[in-house]
Amino acid sequence: SHTFFMNNTEEFYKFYRDKLIVKGVKPNKAHIALAKLEEKGKLKAVITQNIDGLHQMAGSKNVLELHGSTLRNYCMDCGKSYDIDYIENSKGVPKCECGGIIKPDVVLYEEMLNDDTITKSVQYISNADVLIIGGTSLNVYPAAGFINYFKGSKLVIINKAATSADKNADLVISEPIGEVLGSLKTVSYTH
């Protein structure tokens, strides 16, 4: 939480370095398929709650990260940006050259989502012809409520477990998203 970060910053960073900085992780088949769909002009945006940067690693360009990214960090005083390597290699609480505390650019409990990211996400969803929702239980708000802005013709849900939106979907695929999107022949799509 934001309160924990502010009151126990050193302990926060111990946990953060141990559990949230994951080196060597690679995009899966779903990340790669989405990047290929975007490259072919079939996908306008990826809206994600993930904070790992894997969509960008796979090649997606238009990624809206609702909860931020562990790959970006900033000084709380002057705003200077720092990459994940700086955080990983620093000792204790990472400090900026100005002396300010560096914070990961992730949304912690008690913090608001970025207004610009919300606005863009709602615009993409409300203008979409087809909305594919995948790999989410649709239980985390406010992101789960974004589905209410969809006015297009086809809603597709890809998730291992049932979601509250399944009854409104045109297609529900109850399989892991990596397997489903990984099986698409995205290379054969034409304009």
Model-derived segments and spans:
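Conserved catalytic core of sirtuin-type NAD+-dependent deacylases
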Residues: 1-189
